[in-house]
């Protein structure tokens, strides 16, 4: 086997199933490897930003990495905005980038650039492969790093891809054990039972079904309010799921909301800050007079951490459906008249099917949607944790490939759509739902 085949076989043995790619000359051995090594299906994208956005959507819905295959530094540059979103959302991505042959780099050919430095801006882990002897181990290490909820970048020179391997052992990723800090759970239980007004701010995996179920039980026990980050990578919403109040985008409204609380417990989200530096407003949305407690757990352990908090509080094992916010589906009436942004939000909330995946990049047009959809049938919503627009249509591609049995609805702002229109070609080519 050559290096490309070793890489693909290692990834397939680790459970990876898809690769989103816009390859070039330096990636041809890997392209050929998809034909000779079974297990990973390649999906062609016409633009690298669509490939990286699709990998983000796929990873958010499966909790395992898709592979991206990008062409040299400029290909990485074209895809970097949606890798930024993936990084901010804690999405697992195996980001493979082709590089010039090792002996050709000194020629300073037109496409030569400092890939490693650029990759470092979005990668939680990265490595440049220098020999086929370590390529399987390098790939396994990258996958293990990605599974921790980050972009793991592997830079592979073309001669490492095409060279035959003297060592054909296939290595497995070594997955690190999950961690939950018990002291932080005990501290959270203490402050939640104070007689002061308290909020539990949820983010990341705390917004999955298990996390929200535990948060609902904590709310019933302690009387705290449930808040959520503004643009979560993934959140479960709808009837029967504990509802959260979204921290507003604009600083004045966000400060008004958060200043109501003397005690703040944070689970799975960094302390909230303003999106930009707004004149006359602080960057921090919390203040020094508030008592702030952070639940310390790795990304995947947050639901378990909240369940541990339930046990520490001796919260109820079950709560009534009415305690989640809505016990019955309530749909708005279909509006009449012109199709406005507000009416589009109403129509979507009125018609979206049960178990839909809503990829929400509606930006300013979708302000009415969130409060309307909280009483819709249970659904998953994905938003824009990194703020880099142009994610919606590619993310919908990845979500549809990840969950072909579920309808995917992309609520898309027209301006943001212009960045990654090529995703429509991918949706049509693959016949996605």
Residue locations for each model-derived region?
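Active-site diphosphate/adenylate-binding microenvironment
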Residues: 4-8, 12-17, 22-26, 30-35, ...
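Thiamine diphosphate
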Residues: 28-102, 200, 215, 220, ...
